[in-house]
């Protein structure tokens, strides 16, 4: 967004300088011009990140799938069982309660806890007044144990949502409905990514007469080949990566079909 405000001059000026010496240039990891992985500030890992731009899942959409307020909380807030922390705290039940009260709130009389609102990222867990490394490590693992992350305007699924406790608790019908919703969101995001790439790459390619080549190896998003073709950006064709990823066994593409 900041680069756009400056009319992408940071990139353009470098391409103009390079054009004095070269006839062709390579755009490394061109997929990042379509969408980039954004990580919440303060997170120590990329697990709770999302693509940017992205299409959020709204509360209303989750309610239409049959998830009420409490179940949406279950999907989006890490729930920690006392015994999970007790196991790394010498099986000290009362001592574990004392530690958890520092950064968590107990749900009624259940042996189940939610992080306090003051805990915004896993760095806050590492910085809290708990001495045990093992307790902190387990708490940060549980911090990432959620299907959804709440943001302004809705929620987004974490990349590993199918490995979470919340996902395992859903029945097959709920999993199917949620997967269908994500598929619809991905279709919309594909259009967002295409629009962004056409804007940014279009500005760069027309800034000089150099031939543009893109590093687009591996499995990519659906709109990528068309955008590169429309903007006359050459692809890198490496035999082991040039495959039909959508077909069974992902066969290699024949040399005659190379662009």
Give, region by region, the residue ranges found by the protein language model.
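Catalytic cores of glycan-processing enzymes that make or break glycosidic bonds
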Residues: 1-259
């Amino acid at each position: 967004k900041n680069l756009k405000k400056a009319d992408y001059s940071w990139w353009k000026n470098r391409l103009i300088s390079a054009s004095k010496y070269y006839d062709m240039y390579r755009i490394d990891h061109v997929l990042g011009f379509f969408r980039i992985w954004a990580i919440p500030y303060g997170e120590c890992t990329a697990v709770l990140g999302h693509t940017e731009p992205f299409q959020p899942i709204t509360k209303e959409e989750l309610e239409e799938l049959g998830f009420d307020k409490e179940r949406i909380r279950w999907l989006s807030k890490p729930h920690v069982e006392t015994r999970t922390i007790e196991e790394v705290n010498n099986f000290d039940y009362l001592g574990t309660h004392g530690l958890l009260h520092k950064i968590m709130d107990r749900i009624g009389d259940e042996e189940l806890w939610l992080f306090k609102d003051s805990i915004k990222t896993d760095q806050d867990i590492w910085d809290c007044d708990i001495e045990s490394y093992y307790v902190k490590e387990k708490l940060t693992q549980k911090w990432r144990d959620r299907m959804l992350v709440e943001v302004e305007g809705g929620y987004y699924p974490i990349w590993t949502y199918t490995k979470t406790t919340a996902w395992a608790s859903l029945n097959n019908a709920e999993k199917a409905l949620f997967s269908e919703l994500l598929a619809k969101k991905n279709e919309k995001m594909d259009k967002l990514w295409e629009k962004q790439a056409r804007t940014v790459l279009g500005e760069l390619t027309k800034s000089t007469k150099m031939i543009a080549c893109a590093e687009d190896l591996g499995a990519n998003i659906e709109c990528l080949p068309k955008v590169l073709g429309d903007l006359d950006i050459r692809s890198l064709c490496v035999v082991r990566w040039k495959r039909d990823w959508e077909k069974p066994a992902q066969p290699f593409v024949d040399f005659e079909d190379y662009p």
